[in-house]
């Protein structure tokens, strides 16, 4: 996998971290799942 950097508001990161902690996931896992879901519902086939 490649490393990707992006900017996000502090509030969004706080929510992301809280969700990840509650689910026992890493932040990157939550972001990957969110991107896959985003693309899938728009008709893109994602292998991952």
Curated annotation (Swiss-Prot):
GO BP terms, alphabetized: regulation of DNA-templated transcription
Pfam families (UniProt xref): RHH_1
Domain of life (superkingdom): Viruses
Record-given protein name: Uncharacterized protein ORF48
């Amino acid at each position: 996998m490649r490393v990707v950097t992006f900017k996000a508001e502090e509030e969004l990161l706080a929510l992301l971290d809280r969700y990840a902690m509650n689910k026992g996931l890493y932040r990157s896992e939550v972001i990957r799942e969110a991107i896959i879901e985003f693309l899938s519902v728009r008709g893109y086939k994602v292998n991952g």
